[in-house]
Amino acid sequence: MAAGPTTAEKSGASGAKRSSKGSSDGPSRPGTRNRKFRMPGTRALLITLGVLLLVAGGLWALYGSTWFRVERVKTSGTSVLTPREVEAAAAVPLGAPLVTVDTDAIEARIRKELPRVDSVDVVRSWPHGIGLKVTERKPVLLIEKGGKFIEVDATGMRFATVDTAPRNVPRLVLDSASSPSLRRFDADRLLQEAVGVRGELPAEIARDTRVVRITSYDSVTLELTRGRTVFWGSGEHGAVKARVLTALLKATPKAGHFDVSAPTAPASSGS
């Protein structure tokens, strides 16, 4: 009877199988790496080179060439100011690459040098221009001082002093020197109150208003054309007071004095 394989023979056979399996797996790994890290082809290299050349050319055109340089500045929107005044304050760097112009810095210079400017948009106008779109402040009240007139805008800002009063802009009179209101509200606070009242006036009444007189927080009087006066009171309920005053002026056109300080109980008197 033939004897079976010994333990040593079994171990040898098993080892041979593992060795054979390992040898079959070994050569495939280098091939896998070669396929994964294959060098790019000629077409890919040419495309990459073309993109780089386009980028470099674009940068040179914007920064290095004379194609896109600032050659002119155009100002629009001025009324009292002149384009030359705005452009002098802007100090746009002529000859500089258009792409490098600091538009925020230009805006800041204009606003600093010209308080009359309420806002300005600085825009690049390719290929050679800078545009300055200006919005000027408009006076709603005038403060007379030393024979000149200080212009006040709708925010209460004093922005300019002029020799001649603009047409149809009422004069502000602050009769508050001896008023107890100054203990609680300073002159600037009363100015804001007067500006608020002026802003509530309908266009037709605003055109007829010659003086806005304020004595205290709750004592604002309007002086209209033809010697008419309006006691407005405080700035509260301004829109309602404006509607009531419009109705009173139509209902009693010959009256000389109007009181809308209490808009639910308005009154008119005189002739």
Curated annotation (Swiss-Prot):
Keyword Cell membrane listed: yes
Region described as Disordered: 1-37
GO BP annotations, alphabetical order: cell septum assembly; FtsZ-dependent cytokinesis
GO annotation, cellular component aspect: cell division site; plasma membrane
All ranges on the Extracellular side of the membrane: 65-271
Alphabetized UniProt keyword annotations: Cell cycle, Cell division, Cell membrane, Membrane, Transmembrane, Transmembrane helix
Localization of this protein: Cell membrane
Domain POTRA span(s) in chain numbering: 68-137
Function according to Swiss-Prot or TrEMBL: Essential cell division protein.
HAMAP family per UniProt: FtsQ_subfam
Protein name: Cell division protein FtsQ
Organism: Streptomyces venezuelae (strain ATCC 10712 / CBS 650.69 / DSM 40230 / JCM 4526 / NBRC 13096 / PD 04745)
Name of the gene encoding the protein in the UniProt record: ftsQ
